[in-house]
Amino acid sequence: MKQPFGKRLTMLVAAVCLALTATPAEARDVSLADAIAEALAANTGLRVTAQGEKTAEAELREAKGQNNWSASTSASASTDKQKEEDRSTSGSVGLTFNYPLYTGGKNEANIRSSEYGVDIAGLTTERARETLKYDVIKAYFDALESRHTIEVNQDSVNYYDANLTNVQQLYSAGSKARIDVLRASVELSDARQTLIKSENAYQVNLATLRNLMNIDRTEPLNLTDDFAYDTFDIDLASCVDYATRNRKDILADQYTLQQKEEAVKVAEAGWKPTVNFSAGPSLSKTFEPSMRNESTYDMKAGVSASWDIFDSGVTRAQVDRAKADRDTAQLNLQKAQEDADLSVRTAYYNMREAEHRLDSTQDAVGQAEQDAYIAREKYRAGEGIMLDVIDAQRALSTARLNHISAQYDYARYKAQVIDEMGVGLTDAERTAAAKLAGLPIETAPTQTITEPAGGAADEETKDTAKHAEQQAAVDATVNALSDNSEELASDVADELAGNGE
């Protein structure tokens, strides 16, 4: 006996969802604190940022070396032959020590600028840690929200599946029209599609979390923490004030401004003289002619000074450029403060909006559950229509999803407010972050692209073929429906005219 279209579609979509929702065994339990700690200890992007500290420290050593002793050696050899004279051959070797006595303040300014650079690099790394912490929190809550969304969508699928069975039974008994069966089948199909999309979103969010934690990209995870409402009692003005005074990127911009001030001093040093001290021994020896074979040893010390009194305006141009860079840094600092003010306010307003939604959406869920129950019972009693049942179920799903959204919006925006304020890491998080420096830097392997010889199964894309088979089954169902379209149209017309069986 040929099964009804709705029943066949239900079985097909159920098989699809069963394949997609299968979860691997032995998933690792991960709390939010664990996720943050692992990310701080292993995130590659954070490691890249931390390398800037080593660069800044090397630049500081270089600047200090420019203002200290240096030594150089020299050697020469020459031969000379003039007409009617014997050939003359001689050589010399020398060692010279140099020390900059006065550079017009250039070397000292470069040292101070490099010291600011070390501070900037440290603040940049610290800010990157705080941002990474927020990114992990967001990814964690995104995954949790997706997981609860799956639960709601699965409940909808279960309801529409049961509803389809009920409608088919009523249709077989002659108390409902066939158009109700078709409508119930379509709603079940739509619910299945929504479920599949939410399951995919969950996997994408887990992949994002694994990437931030820098763990095995295929490792199954079980997120053990969940939303718990916790009040945020700090007023907006205090949040903005804290951000202005404590944001690491704003502090880094302040140091950058100081660097540009030192750059002006470096440029202005071009108008001043330089004084250098040099001293060292030298040895010279004459080899030919043999009658003049002699050696000379000297020790010299002296002070030299130089002063560029005219350079066609080159120094003036360098000073003007340095001052323009300083003014730009001042504007960048002002803009960073304004951006921080806006970002804190935006996150704060969004957090409060989500907080207000928590209570209202909770009430809406209870009301929607009652409405859905009434609609189902009225339909079973023959006093309601299918549209009322569908609308009530949709309203219930929407209310539940809105409540879930409000919960995790509040959690995410609260974390964003804390991040935008520039609140530092906890002691435990700093301990985890300290492990980052000890990781070795591995050389990325070079891969050669070759055509596969054996065509082994791809674990990452193995479901693609399965989905293709499922799509083929759906296409077959649609084709079958198209073949029976004239019969279905006739049946629907009869039912609308009151002649349905």
Ranges and model annotations:
Residues 47, 70-88, 98-129, 251, ...:
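Small/polar (Gly/Ser/Thr/Ala-rich) solvent-exposed segments
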Residues 1-26:
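Gram-negative bacterial Sec-dependent N-terminal signal peptides
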Residues 94-96, 140, 276, 302-304, ...:
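Membrane-embedded beta-strand positions in outer-membrane beta-barrel channels/transporters
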Residues 2-3, 8, 129-242, 347-350, ...:
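Periplasmic alpha-helical coiled-coil/stalk elements that build and connect Gram-negative outer-membrane
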Residues 28-36:
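Regulatory alphaC helix of protein kinase catalytic domains
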Residues 90-92, 138, 183, 274, ...:
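Transmembrane beta-barrel architecture of outer-membrane proteins
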Residues 48-63, 128, 132-152, 162, ...:
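Amphipathic alpha-helical coiled-coil segments
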Residues 2-4, 26, 402-501:
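Acidic, low-complexity, intrinsically disordered peripheral segments
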